[in-house]
């Protein structure tokens, strides 16, 4: 699943090509995504100028002169820049055609993503209204995590993956941040000290920023806006490394199911 770094990589890649241009055509080849593409999306978007491309958690916000298109890449989605006449591949479901012979193409084999229009400020949309702070913003730190964790018995990994606590920390980066902070993923969230949460908050931001610089993580489906893979997988310390030696102590990395998600940790380094 594309996580925050992959979505941010996409945002940085597509924005220079489409910001400031008007939509001249919308082509919907398959409307059945997680939520159906609005039937009147073409009528709504045609003639509107794109003013900005933002990210909120794992959502991309395409701001037009009036209204916003909210995009989520789901489990396997991607957005790429191409020429409008470039033949669509299988699973290329939606084209946004801009002035200047530019096309933003939405590709999603599993169709778990979405493209939704809102005329209101997107921050009020039900998908975004309850999101926690951005993990790369100054408003997010370990004190925020410690405050929300008080009295909670849920596993800390599930806690930091709750988008109401912090927006956009997915499975890959939760595993990696907890390893760097030396915290066992199953430890109850309410039984972790402020000092350890401060350390964890720093590592969450650190691992996300490092992945963005590497263009994201390629595991199965993710490629960036140009079709190139991300490279952060090459430096993953625990994720997808079950049975391999810990890069710090040599102990074999273990994998368990936690909250129905594959969870990787070092039994020696993480307590």
Curated annotation (Swiss-Prot):
PANTHER family: FORMAMIDOPYRIMIDINE-DNA GLYCOSYLASE. It comes from Methylococcus capsulatus (strain ATCC 33009 / NCIMB 11132 / Bath). InterPro entries: DNA_glyclase/AP_lyase_DNA-bd (IPR015886), DNA_glyclase_Znf_dom_DNA_BS (IPR015887), Formamido-pyr_DNA_Glyclase (IPR020629), FPG_cat (IPR012319), MutM-like_N-ter (IPR035937), Ribosomal_uS13-like_H2TH (IPR010979), Znf_DNA_glyclase/AP_lyase (IPR000214), Znf_FPG/IleRS (IPR010663). A zinc finger (FPG-type) spans 237-271. The keyword DNA repair applies. This is Formamidopyrimidine-DNA glycosylase. Its EC number is 3.2.2.23, 4.2.99.18. Binds 1 zinc ion per subunit.
């Amino acid at each position: 699943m594309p996580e925050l770094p992959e979505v941010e990589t996409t945002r940085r890649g597509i924005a220079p090509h489409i910001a400031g241009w008007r939509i001249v055509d919308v082509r919907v080849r398959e409307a059945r995504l997680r939520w159906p593409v609005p039937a009147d999306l073409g009528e709504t978007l045609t003639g509107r100028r794109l003013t900005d491309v933002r990210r909120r958690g794992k959502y991309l916000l395409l701001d037009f002169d009036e209204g916003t298109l909210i995009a989520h890449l789901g489990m396997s989605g991607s957005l790429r820049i191409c020429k409008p006449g470039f033949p669509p591949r299988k699973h290329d479901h939606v084209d946004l055609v801009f002035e200047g012979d530019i096309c933003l193409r939405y590709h999603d084999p599993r169709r778990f993503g979405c493209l939704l229009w809102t005329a209101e400020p997107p921050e009020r949309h039900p998908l975004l209204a309850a999101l926690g702070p951005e993990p790369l913003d100054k408003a997010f730190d370990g004190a925020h995590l410690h405050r929300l964790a008080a009295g909670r018995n849920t596993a800390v990994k599930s806690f930091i993956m709750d988008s109401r606590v912090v927006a956009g920390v997915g499975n890959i980066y939760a595993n990696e941040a907890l390893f760097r902070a030396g915290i066992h993923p199953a430890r109850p969230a309410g039984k972790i000290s402020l000092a350890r949460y401060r350390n964890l908050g720093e590592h969450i931001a650190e691992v996300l920023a490092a992945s963005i610089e590497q263009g994201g993580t390629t595991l199965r489906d993710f490629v960036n806006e140009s079709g190139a893979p991300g490279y952060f997988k090459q430096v993953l310390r625990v994720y997808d490394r079950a049975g391999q030696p810990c890069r710090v102590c040599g102990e074999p990395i273990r994998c368990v199911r936690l909250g129905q998600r594959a969870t990787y940790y070092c039994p020696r380094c993480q307590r």
